[in-house]
Amino acid sequence: MEAERQNQIAARLADYAEREQALRRYLDYDAKTERLHVVNAELEDPAVWNDPKHAQDLGREKKSLEDVVQTLTELGQGVADALELFELAAADEDDATLESIENDANTFQERLEGLEFRRMFSNPADPLNCFLDIQAGAGGTEAQDWASMLLRQYLKYAERKGFKAEVLEESEGEIAGIKSATIKLEGEYAFGYLRTETGVHRLVRKSPFDSSGGRHTSFASVFVYPEVDESFEVEVNPADLRVDTYRASGAGGQHINKTDSAVRITHMPSGIVVQCQNDRSQHRNRAEAMQMLKSKLYELEMRKRMAEQQKLEDSKTDVGWGHQIRSYVLDQSRIKDLRTNVEISNTQKVLDGDLDPFIQASLKQGV
């Protein structure tokens, strides 16, 4: 192997070793390692299951800690071993081993970039699960079909990221598509990844519902908010709530819901409305709807505080109906984020859930 290529490998490995050490400091590796020992000890005690909720919380914390501790441990050891092996292989002019180390360096780079990306998650709610609301805009069938395309896109994205996704509510369109839907996404940093998707998404295409093949523009809004837990205090006065029950909508068949199990809760002071119909139990639907309401109220309060403290310009604080964030122009094979100017020509890949280029750019630019 030529000397210049060897020098590049050596420089990369040295750089990765420095970055790995910097990440240990930034991500509190030592403190997390100690905490992981404590959590493991608690989980090994059979008495922990006397309080199932506490045990589940510990299980989630363990997974989160292991995600950092194990990754950094393996990465640090891997880079150190590669550096040592590189010295031997270079001295012996062992090209096969040097090429293998070069391939390992590519893997180290990917893992480092994944950990470094976590530095973008500055919001205290970023590690939490989240809810994602989709609402079709004006325009009837065309807009409702677009809303259903977005629903599919985010479900595909969840699949790619390894998130658990559950459709809690889905209101069908009159002819095709959906009027609205709510998804619950569970996974590490689900809210952190998806929070910059809040806004209006614009579709331009030749409509399949127009026999003349005319070009149509449609809009749908997306709103993402974290699932809050007991560590986030959200007070809800029962007197401020109006609770309605209704029969869940659906295509029918032998499993059609014959009872009024779907629940809609209106928070009258804020005007926030949430609904849940995914379970046959009215009690469980009500509990899920209350969780959604508390999460929305928390996100609303956080946005108010952010606006007051940072006085961000309108383009960053306005998440109303008129705030377009992304334009999907399908007949020109172009999807462009209007905040970061990231543009992708492979429209089908994006609609199949490959949103990482947009999301990463948004987080890096602090959108």
UniProtKB/Swiss-Prot annotation:
SUPFAM superfamilies: Release factor
Residue(s) carrying N5-methylglutamine: Q254
GO molecular function: translation release factor activity, codon specific
Protein's cellular compartments: Cytoplasm
Cross-referenced Pfam families: PCRF (PF03462), RF-1 (PF00472)
PTM entry text: Methylated by PrmC. Methylation increases the termination efficiency of RF2.
GO terms (BP aspect): viral translational frameshifting
Note: The gene for this protein contains a UGA in-frame termination codon after Leu-27; a naturally occurring frameshift enables complete translation of RF-2. This provides a mechanism for the protein to regulate its own production.
Family affiliation: Belongs to the prokaryotic/mitochondrial release factor family.
Protein's name according to its UniProt entry: Peptide chain release factor 2
Organism encoding this protein: Bordetella avium (strain 197N)
